[in-house]
Amino acid sequence: MIDIKLLRLNSEIFYKSCRDRGFDTRILDEFFELDNEWKENLKQLNNIKHDKNSITMEISRRIKSGDDINDLKLKVESLNIDIQRLEGRQNEIDVKRNEILRLIPNLLADDVPRCFGDENNRLVRYYGRARVFSDDVKYFIENSGSGDYEEIDYRPKSHVDLISELNLADIERAGKIAGARFYFLKNRLFKLELALINYAVDFLSQRGYTVLEPPFMINYKSMSGATDIETFKDTLYKIEGDDLYLIATAEHPIASMLQDEILMEDELPIRVSGVSPCFRREAGAHGKDTKGIFRVHQFNKIEQFVFCKPEDSWDFFDELVRNSEDIYKSLKIPYRVVNVCSGELGNLAAKKYDIEAWFPAQGKFREIVSASNDTDYQARSLNIKYRSRDGNRFVHTLNSTAIATERILVAIMENFQDRNGKVIKIPEVLIPYTGFSEIGGDDN
């Protein structure tokens, strides 16, 4: 939720920010119409209360002097009816206005590219030495800005083929019991997933992040405070008969755990890494990535989250991105970082960086990390403050993926298979966690 005082004082910057996002500015018109009605109604209410106070004082004077007060009592009764009517209307306007206020997106950071479409996200940097099939070289250079790659004369096997040939997952049987986009993860691929989780937890713990496992369900109040639930609702699984949803990301319960609290200044920053399954209906992804485990209804993710003071939030944004990059550098997975353009940002984010890994079998970069600075937008919705010398202030909240395991399993399978697709090498940093150095081959 945005700051209503800032909106009133700087309406034009919000109109521009909405236009830059491709957001319908009529919602701002509706807000100001209601806000003006709220102000006018409040003015009338205060005037009537003032009149009532004056009459009440006159009644007291007349009682002391023994004068008749019946006419004044009738006036007070009439004013009470008006007050009740105006207070009811004031509450109605307040509810509607706050509902609209929740829909107005966050102000964009100055360096967010003002454009539309994922293809217009701005390249920030590239890392790694990718294996690139000859047919994909032109795309790779254009989208990485790098000439650092190894050209290969064969297309690596897709992870769909690898999990079948190496007996790493059973999607067909999962489909019998749960439908499309579910899977049984098996054998060394499952152990590799556990290794990724434990590696990421240790990695972030060493950098001062408190690891936790959040509840896997969240109530409506918390969910609507943590995210734009109207945008997210087609993605969420609702628990029938309960005020609960399965979580789509650990971000939402972590953000909500401090709702309606006032922290002490010296408690900040609070760094958290959350480990959880994520449940998503993927209603808007019909026809996309229908095979394999790249886009599924259930996956595991390690999320980074920070509560901090406003003046520190951009430093923590850089820290979150750096943490994620360092993880993928250590795994030796080639990737690029992009500054997501205004038309592709969700309502909460003032700015978002995506990290996209190179997937040589697909011949393209695909998103594996999203890092966002939500400034005070999320904290206002959840009412999370801290006590400073200048009074109570809203914290800033930031979040970033560390590892979404299924996508990284796919990245490892595509990037580290041998020429024949018979053996998948395990990244060196994961071998102490797996106890094996490859999938396939003679030692399996």
Curated annotation (Swiss-Prot):
Subcellular location(s) per record: Cytoplasm
Keywords assigned by UniProt, alphabetized: Aminoacyl-tRNA synthetase, ATP-binding, Cytoplasm, Ligase, Nucleotide-binding, Protein biosynthesis
GO molecular function: ATP binding; serine-tRNA ligase activity
Pfam family, one: Seryl_tRNA_N
Reaction catalyzed: tRNA(Ser) + L-serine + ATP = L-seryl-tRNA(Ser) + AMP + diphosphate + H(+); tRNA(Sec) + L-serine + ATP = L-seryl-tRNA(Sec) + AMP + diphosphate + H(+)
Pathway: Aminoacyl-tRNA biosynthesis; selenocysteinyl-tRNA(Sec) biosynthesis; L-seryl-tRNA(Sec) from L-serine and tRNA(Sec): step 1/1
Cellular-component GO terms for this entry: cytoplasm
Role: Catalyzes the attachment of serine to tRNA(Ser). Is also able to aminoacylate tRNA(Sec) with serine, to form the misacylated tRNA L-seryl-tRNA(Sec), which will be further converted into selenocysteinyl-tRNA(Sec).
Similarity section: Belongs to the class-II aminoacyl-tRNA synthetase family. Type-1 seryl-tRNA synthetase subfamily.
Subunit structure comment from the entry: Homodimer. The tRNA molecule binds across the dimer.
UniProt-recorded name of the protein: Serine--tRNA ligase
Species for this entry: Picrophilus torridus (strain ATCC 700027 / DSM 9790 / JCM 10055 / NBRC 100828 / KAW 2/3)
